[in-house]
Amino acid sequence: MERNKFASKMSQHYTKTICIAVVLVAVLFSLSSAAAAGSGAAVSVQLEALLEFKNGVADDPLGVLAGWRVGKSGDGAVRGGALPRHCNWTGVACDGAGQVTSIQLPESKLRGALSPFLGNISTLQVIDLTSNAFAGGIPPQLGRLGELEQLVVSSNYFAGGIPSSLCNCSAMWALALNVNNLTGAIPSCIGDLSNLEIFEAYLNNLDGELPPSMAKLKGIMVVDLSCNQLSGSIPPEIGDLSNLQILQLYENRFSGHIPRELGRCKNLTLLNIFSNGFTGEIPGELGELTNLEVMRLYKNALTSEIPRSLRRCVSLLNLDLSMNQLAGPIPPELGELPSLQRLSLHANRLAGTVPASLTNLVNLTILELSENHLSGPLPASIGSLRNLRRLIVQNNSLSGQIPASISNCTQLANASMSFNLFSGPLPAGLGRLQSLMFLSLGQNSLAGDIPDDLFDCGQLQKLDLSENSFTGGLSRLVGQLGNLTVLQLQGNALSGEIPEEIGNMTKLISLKLGRNRFAGHVPASISNMSSLQLLDLGHNRLDGVFPAEVFELRQLTILGAGSNRFAGPIPDAVANLRSLSFLDLSSNMLNGTVPAALGRLDQLLTLDLSHNRLAGAIPGAVIASMSNVQMYLNLSNNAFTGAIPAEIGGLVMVQTIDLSNNQLSGGVPATLAGCKNLYSLDLSGNSLTGELPANLFPQLDLLTTLNISGNDLDGEIPADIAALKHIQTLDVSRNAFAGAIPPALANLTALRSLNLSSNTFEGPVPDGGVFRNLTMSSLQGNAGLCGGKLLAPCHGHAAGKKRVFSRTGLVILVVLIALSTLLLLMVATILLVSYRRYRRKRRAADIAGDSPEAAVVVPELRRFSYGQLAAATNSFDQGNVIGSSNLSTVYKGVLAGDADGGMVVAVKRLNLEQFPSKSDKCFLTELATLSRLRHKNLARVVGYAWEAGKIKALVLDYMVNGDLDGAIHGGAAAPPPAPSRWTVRERLRVCVSVAHGLVYLHSGYDFPVVHCDVKPSNVLLDGDWEARVSDFGTARMLGVHLPAAANAAAQSTATSSAFRGTVGYMAPEFAYMRTVSTKVDVFSFGVLAMELFTGRRPTGTIEEDGVPLTLQQLVDNAVSRGLDGVHAVLDPRMKVATEADLSTAADVLAVALSCAAFEPADRPDMGAVLSSLLKMSKLVGED
């Protein structure tokens, strides 16, 4: 019974268990079916999102998305355990359940917009679209991706702001937005990304301050926000980021002090905050960063001394504190940094001596101490730095002998010690420096012979021993320097003959031997220097017939051989020097006539044949072919006869003509009226006859000096001489002029010196003006003159007021005449000295094959057809032209097609005559370079067109606010700016933006890119009035950047002469000898800044007190008179609200003047200019 009861209970229990099991199975089956259905739905959503992503891609040149397609039955849920087909698509990865976790398509050249549907793929963990061409905004819908860990969209064209919705991606640990066009502030909620370890957004247009919430990113390891427009200070809370390893904030607008709290970031290895506006001291607490390897604080406004506590940064490899305002001594404690490889302290105000302890830095490879106030000798133990490769100490007051131990620095490649007070002989043993490539010791007091072992440095490329007191001869061993490109020995006391072996230096580009005591003949071997561009032999004792071998140097642009003893005629072979822009053969004993061959030098800007024994007529055909002469034509002090050729009027750009002291006859040619840019004309000491041409003077209204004395000219002085409003010196003495002295001369307010003596003038001497202080010597020899204190009263005329002729007036007159004469004599010398530095040889692209198109591919840029651009510009209709030059015409265009969405562009169609087929290699090669130049202050190149013999064109972003020229001066091409655009702040902002762009061109790429034509019309203004430098590739496409030899081989005559820059903005060395360096752009930038703040063009007529001035002279005079003087020359449309505004404007003009210095060596680099401008921005609140 009991057993039956037990059995019955067990039976009931089992029945219940079975029922429960059946129910559980049913429930599980139901849940499984629901999960399967849910999974299928999720897959469907993700598939749709992927297809929408593909639809947003307008161009897929590599076909990476070609396999992103759905079969006939679709790609639905998981079937039979297999993953959905889209999990195998290129760049897509899924988890085991078929959910998309990753989209990675870096460097795929995709172009289009990023689809917001990606926000529907809730399982996404990684998005990597690095180095594509996505544009438009970053979709805010990405903020729905709660599992997203990495968002990497670097190197695209994304615009707009950083969506604040991204702060919802709580799993995010890597956010990389660098190299885009993002604007606006960093979202204030960025601190909500508590897992963030890497935050990169460099090279954008972000502004505003660092959000305080960043202090909550306790796990952050990398912060790189460099190259933006961020402002404000670094918050002290940054010291709470204990895991921070890399902090890069360089090239922004940060200001204030560097926070001491940074010293608490013990894991910091890289600190780059250069090129900002930080002020105050370098915190001593930075010495606590014992793991720090790189500290670069240069280009700020830091003051006080270098903290000695930096001795504790024992891991430092690179310490760069240059280009600040640091004072005091160099701390000896820096010698305790055992790992230091680079120490850069240049361009500060450091004083005292160079500490001997620095020679303990045995790993040091770079030591830069230039442009300070250092004195005393270099440490005798400098030779301990056996790994040193660069020793840069120029522009100090270092003295004593160069230490002998320097010969132990056998790795030394660059030793720049010029502009110091070093004395004594060069040390022995320099020949051991077999790695030495640049040795610059110019402008010191070194003496003795040049040691022979110096010529064992076979790797030398530049040797500058100029402006010292070296004596003795130039050794024949100089021929061992086969790699030398620049040899500067001018300004010494070297003697003897120039050795024949000098011809072994076949790579030489610049040879300066002027102002020595070299004698004898120029060696014939000089013809081997086929790359030579500059040859200075002036002011020596060289003799004999001018060597024909010189005229085999077909790359020469400057030839200075004046003040020697050369004899004989000028050879016809001079015609071989087709690139010559400067020719000085003055003060020799040359005879014969002017050869017709001179007429073939169509690039000539300056010609000086004065003080020789040349005779015969001045050939009109030669003069007619010299239409490019811009600066100086001097044929004075020879024996030329005959008439002044009428063709002289074709020299429309010449500024000085001197034909004095010859035997010229006939009249003054009326065609001189064509020389509309003439400042000085000297025809004195000839046998010219007849009257002065009618209507001559109104055409020469820029003249400041006119000397026609010592001729046989007669008739009356024309009344229209009153048109010479700028004349300062006028000498008509020793002629046969008659009649009355024109009363209008008294009204020429600029006139300071007047000589009317030895003529037959009659009647009263005018009152006023220059006549108030005129001396008797300026009037004597005119028996018919009357009036005044020293002359008999005039009969029939009212006696004028008595005048006192003082000795002071005579002294002033003599001084003025002397200064005018000295000015003429100095012109040639100034032009020669101006070329101290020359462009270093640049590698020209060596493109193999006959087809440039096949040789160079520019995948980064879109290629357009002729038809596409014709459709965009209405067949290049003139109504669409927004700019033109001899090199190109720019059209406004609208791209057709759905992909372009009516995108407005600027189409720059190049002139095929100036860009012939021979320039195709340069054109296509430089397109590849342009495609990689990406900066917020450079005009973006969208694409290009190239069809042989049909079109060469660049397609650029269209800028709605036109160019800076239109904004300054007005014009149809640019809308008028709002009144606020004319404040000091806004103009300074433009300068900063242009400087940013040029700094990037000069130092942001593998090699410096020199613009060569910086001017307001090449600065474009976008919708926010942000300045963008354009046209930075034209010079390179014409091969202007190439070494002369390569350029000659690659370019036609049309190409080599087409790109001339723009008059008024060209640096002298570029105008005269086509030398290309970054200092060319610095000069142009200085002129641009002056034009921007004064509203005056550099090519316009500028007067001050009736005296003609260049824009630089006007600004220089104004700055020298202080703030009142500056205020007088500022653009009246510019609002100057406060004294701080005026002071800032004065500071900008002072920087601009330094940029426009005549000597390239005297100009700052664009980095230093930008640093100065950023410091000024703070004063006007431009943060």
Swiss-Prot record:
Induction: Induced by flagellin (flg22). It comes from the Eukaryota. Coiled coil: none annotated. The keyword Glycoprotein applies. Disulfide bonds join 87-94, 167-189. It is a single-pass membrane protein. Residues 1-41 form the signal peptide. Residues 831-1183 are cytoplasmic. Residues 876-1179 form the Protein kinase domain. Keywords: ATP-binding, Cell membrane, Disulfide bond, Glycoprotein, Kinase, Leucine-rich repeat, Membrane, Nucleotide-binding, Plant defense, Receptor, Repeat, Serine/threonine-protein kinase, Signal, Transferase, Transmembrane, Transmembrane helix. InterPro entries: Kinase-like_dom_sf (IPR011009), Leu-rich_rpt (IPR001611), Leu-rich_rpt_typical-subtyp (IPR003591), LRR_dom_sf (IPR032675), LRR_N_plant-typ (IPR013210), Prot_kinase_dom (IPR000719), Ser/Thr_kinase_AS (IPR008271). The chain crosses the membrane at residues 810-830. The active site is at residue 1013. Glycans are attached at residues 88, 120, 168, 181, 267, 363, 395, 408, 414, 483, 504, 528, 591, 634, 707, 747, 755, 773. It is an enzyme of class 2 (transferase). It catalyses: L-seryl-[protein] + ATP = O-phospho-L-seryl-[protein] + ADP + H(+); L-threonyl-[protein] + ATP = O-phospho-L-threonyl-[protein] + ADP + H(+). Interacts with SERK2. Constitutes the pattern-recognition receptor (PPR) that determines the specific perception of flagellin (flg22), a potent elicitor of the defense response to pathogen-associated molecular patterns (PAMPs). Recognizes flg22 from Pseudomonas aeruginosa and Acidovorax avenae. flg22 is a peptide derived from the bacterial flagellin N-terminus sequence. Does not recognize flg22 from Xanthomonas oryzae pv. oryzae (Xoo) or Xanthomonas oryzae pv. oryzicola (Xoc). Belongs to the protein kinase superfamily. Ser/Thr protein kinase family. This is LRR receptor-like serine/threonine-protein kinase FLS2. It comes from Oryza sativa subsp. japonica (Rice). The gene is FLS2.
